[in-house]
Amino acid sequence: MENYLEEELIIGGIEINYLYVCKTKLWYFVRGITMEQESDFVDLGKFLHEKSYFGEEKEVQIGSIKIDFIKKRDVIEIHEVKRGKQMEKAHIMQVLYYIYYLNSLGIKSKAILHYPKLKEIKEIELKENNKEEIKRAIKEIEYIKSLKEPPEPIYQKICKNCAYYELCFI
């Protein structure tokens, strides 16, 4: 695998997630404008994360990524706990980035998404086509970071519950 750790992989998983949720939110976030502390949905997600999967070491930081918890098996299992599947594409891309990142360090891994409220889990493995999408996502994040103004927000159903709603639409 090509080594992209020089600068491309200083991106965090939340940035990958936000790219697939909302590019405007990503732009605010990378500038340190964080509104999540105002969100009841973020609080609910933190509660689920803290109360789920007892006995697991939580929030494992490896370089620029922060994983909910890991298990050591034949490969490293990356575990992410999510509240619901409404933004499943963003969740999948986030954990694919984690796998990609760890692979660049020579660490074999796979990911497991947990949806405790739905009592579902989803196993994710990095495929060749995913690597290309991750590379494109990294380039797009770098482009969004370079913008002097936020991208024009595109209203979605999720916007009404977003912590950044007022910055975008009021």
UniProtKB/Swiss-Prot annotation:
Cofactor binding note from Swiss-Prot or TrEMBL: Mg(2+) or Mn(2+) required for ssDNA cleavage activity. Can also utilise Cu(2+).
Binding locations of Mn(2+): H49, D68, E80
Binding site for [4Fe-4S] cluster: C22, C159, C162, C168
EC identifiers of the protein: 3.1.12.1
Cofactor: Mg(2+); Mn(2+); Cu(2+); [4Fe-4S] cluster
Reaction(s) the record says it catalyses: exonucleolytic cleavage in the 5'- to 3'-direction to yield nucleoside 3'-phosphates
Signal peptide: none
Function, in words: CRISPR (clustered regularly interspaced short palindromic repeat) is an adaptive immune system that provides protection against mobile genetic elements (viruses, transposable elements and conjugative plasmids). CRISPR clusters contain sequences complementary to antecedent mobile elements and target invading nucleic acids. CRISPR clusters are transcribed and processed into CRISPR RNA (crRNA). This protein may be a 5' to 3' ssDNA exonuclease.
Record-given protein name: CRISPR-associated exonuclease Cas4
Organism (species): Methanocaldococcus jannaschii (strain ATCC 43067 / DSM 2661 / JAL-1 / JCM 10045 / NBRC 100440)
